[in-house]
Amino acid sequence: MKIYVVAYLAKNLGDDLFINILTTRYPEHKFYAISKGEKGYDTKNFKVYSNVYMFKALKKFQWEKHLANHYDAVVTIGGSMFMERGDTNRDFSLGKNKRYVLGINFGPYKTQEYYNNIHNMLSNVEDVCFRDKYSYNLFKDLPNVRQAADIVFSMDMSNIKNTNRKRAIISIISPKDKINKKYKKQYEEKMLELISFLIVKGYEICLMSFCKIEHDEEEIEEIYSKIPENQKKKVEKYYYNGNIEEALNTIADSQLVVGGRFHANIIGLCLGKSILPVLYSDKTLHVLQDMQIDTPIIDIRNLESFDIKSITDDDLTRHYDVEKQKEDAQRHFEKLDLQLKKT
């Protein structure tokens, strides 16, 4: 079958994992998508038409739904795919074919109108599977709505080389891109304090970018430039460039993951690492609450209330059993499996 994919194609590690999981699960089917211009996604069964002008025209004039009618099914796969951003009156439908909306959370949103638009759209698709109970509870009146653990938990990481190196992977985000530039100074100060704190405890540090387009790399350079010279020898940088296996092996070569990116925390958990989440929105919090994970949380929106020195050695070495989540995450695909006749 030919499947049209709606996803965030921007060389973002978390979203690239979604695509990898989807296309690997159904190797006998062909997947197609259109990106704003990002290249390097094509595989045996995934073709991306990379054209910024075509992408903008499809979105602006709502031609995408007509294009989608030429495919056997439509799969929307991602995390934060439905955020209001002021677009309260869009037509969210996408053609007449069966549409599957997988792995998402809802929000943030501000108006009832936006919620109603999404509620109406989701009521007309074949299957919706949220990754958190908060989002599910907003739409649970719909018979086609389900909830399962984040899709990345379903990924086979058996080929990844896991170590116990005393190293902390710190996933850095750009506050001005992800939340608000007013938090930038405080965020950088807190990350510098955390880096020093971990180095004193004997950790090596790797500052990791998940997405260049969202300015992770720029923020890393700014933070790195402010690290004292006597500490820089303990700090390295890793910039994700589309090589998923390399990125996962980088994270696996550690004991601790400081997760600014949502999926830094999920990958850390999958690989059996201790995690220290850094929040810029509630989406990570909702998932951690669903999993009943008890760990210190650094909230960028409330940095002044978090004391780095309150982090204990137990916090830095706590591990979590996520076998249940790894199995549960497979359920995102149970309806699509039927459509694509996977047994």
Give the residues covered by each predicted segment.
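Active-site anion-handling motifs in enzyme catalytic cores
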Residues: 1-343
